Structures are given as C-alpha cells and as structure tokens.
Amino acid sequence: MKTVILALALIVLASSTQADVIATIKKIDQSPFGRTLFDTIYLELQTGDPLDRLLSTLTDLEDRYVAEQKEDDAKNQEYQGACTVDISAFDKDLAESNRKKIELEARLEGQLYPQRSILEGLVAQKKAEVKGYQKDLDELDAQRAEEHEDFEEKVLEHQEATAIIAEARRLFADNIEHGSFIQKGKATKQTHKFTKEVASMIQKHFTTSAKKTAKFQHRKGYSKLFKAFATIASKVEQLADAGAVQKIIDLADELLAKIADSLSLLRFAEDKRVEAYKKSRNFIVISLNVAGSALANATSDLASLNDIIAQVEASLDTTEQRIENVSADRHDRFTQCEEAVQDYQDARAARTSDRDVVSQTIGLVNKELRTLREQLALRQQAGEEI
C-alpha cells in the first residue's frame, strides 16, 4: 500500500514538475531574446548536431553577462561617486553664495540703507536751512535797499527844500540891501516897499516850489509852507520897513537850521540802520556759511555712501546671479546623475533578465531536453507559438 502511495506521489510530483518546466519554456519564449535562443536550439536539434558547442556558447554568454555587469557596476559606482563630488561642490558653492548674500543684504538693510536715510534727511534739513538763511539775507538786503532809497528820497527832499528856502532868503536879502527898495535920503523909519517885479518874482518862486514839493513822498508839509510864503510874497510890497523883511530872512535862517538839523538826524538814523544791517547781515552770512558747509559735507558723505551702496548692490546682484547659475548647473548635473542611475538600473534589469533566460535555457538543455524538444516541436506546428 505504501508503495502505491509513494508511486502516486512521485507521479503527481513529476506532473507538477513537468508543468513548471512547460511554464518556464513558455515564459522564455515570450521574450525576443528567449525566442531567438529557442529558434537556435530548434535548428541545432533539427540538424542532429551535438549541443555541446551551443551549451558552451550559452555558458560563455552567461559568464560575459556576469563580467559586463561587474564592469557596469564599477563604472556606475565611479560615475555616481563623481556625481556625489560634483553635487557636494555645487552645494558648498551655493551655501557660500547664500551666506554672502545674507551678509550683503544684512549690510544693506541693517547699515547702509538706514545711514542713507539719515544722510538724506540731513541734506534735506541743511538745504532748508540754506534756503531759509538765503531768504532772510535777500529780505534783509531788499529791506536795506528800500530803506536806503527812502533815505535818499528824504535827503533829496531836504536838499530841495534847503535850496528853495535859501534861494528865497537870497532874494529877500539881496533886495533889502538894494537901493530900489529904500527911499534914499529919508529916515530909516520911513516905509520901504519892494517893487512889483521883485514881489512877483518871489511869489512865482514859492508857487513853483509849492507845486514841486507837493510831489514829495515824505515831507509833504513843505508844499503848504511854500504856499504860505507865496501869499506873503504877494503882499511883500506892503511891508512897512526893512525890519519886517529881516524877520522873514531870520525865519528862513531858522527853517534852514531846522532842515539842517533834521538832515543830520536823518543821516544819524541812517548810519544806525546801516550799522544794524551790517551786524544782522554778518550774522546771517555766518549762519548761511555754516549751513552751507554742513550741506556740502552731508552731500559729499551721501555721494560716497551711495557709491558704497552701488558697489554692495552690484555685488549682491552678482551673488544672486551666481546662485541662479550654480542652481541651474546643479539641477542639470543632478538630472544627469539621476538619468544615469535610471539607465544603469534599466541596463542591469535587462542584462539580468537576459542572463536569467540564458541560465534557465542552459538548465532546460541539460535537464529537460526531452520536454524542451517536444515543446519546440509543438511550437513549430502551432505556427511558432507554444
């Protein structure tokens, strides 16, 4: 009974093994390389030649696959080692460039830009100061020019009035001493009269002067005074004696003295104004020069700082461009290395597959030649498909 069971088990095992062999043959035949091997084996079987040479060729091919794989493994290891070195160099370069970029940005944002902002504010402040002092100076000069013009006008008016009164006094004085105004050979208490011609001349003098002084900007009272003198001149013929005329002359002298005093006070006040003007102007000029010097220094400092900023910004641009270029080079190199890995893996997988086909075929030829022969014959009968 045990013998029967053992025999049945061997039969089942043999059937199972036979099915596995057929499955292996079909699997090999599905690959182009396996089909080519089977075609070659089938031809060898048909000719009846020994399969030793074929087995030797297959064994050599298997050994060559192993050798090629070892060589490919070594090349891949060397290439990937170079990739690691290159990628590490790129990473080191990028790390250094990024460190430099951070330093440059920190210098710009933390130092140079704030300094520029401060200097720009200082320049703006000093410009405003210079502009303000210049405005004060211009206004002071304009005021001084206006004051001087007023002074000159007042002096001219005083001089005009002095000339008018002096001329009138001369006319009175000359005529009081002239024989035509005194009745000769009579006592001094006798009435003395001006001629109509002299009286008319004096009246005309004061009338013309009154009209002229009416245009004065400062001493408008002279016009009224000279009108009054013109009225007196119209009645000068009725003056009782030379004593009355002398009073007019004395009045003219008094007026001339007052005008002279007024002119002296006017000049004194002008001198004081000039003195005050010079002091004020000197103070403003000093302030203007100080502000101007500070502005020039601040402007120079700002220009120098802008040059430094431009250099740092240019260095930052160069660094950023380098980061971009190195990153692109790293990406390209990394892609090359990854593609090389994929090519290596694909080639290894293909070589392993072909080597397995060769190994399995050698096993079939050595151990399952009968089954292989039958399957190849069936394959040929079925239209070269097992």
Swiss-Prot record:
Could you state one GO cellular component term attached to this entry?
Answer: trichocyst
Statement: the UniProt record of this protein carries the keyword Transcription regulation: no
Domain of life, per UniProt, equals Eukaryota
What residue ranges constitute the propeptide? Answer: 20-48, 184-238
Q: Which UniProt keywords apply?
A: Coiled coil, Signal
The stretch of residues making up the signal peptide is 1-19
Compartment(s) where it occurs, according to its Swiss-Prot or TrEMBL record: Trichocyst
**Which chain positions lie within coiled-coil regions?**
51-154, 293-332
Function of the molecule: Structural protein that crystallize inside the trichocyst matrix.
* Similarity comment: family membership: Belongs to the TMP family.
Q: Name it.
A: Trichocyst matrix protein T2-A
Which organism does this record belong to? Paramecium tetraurelia
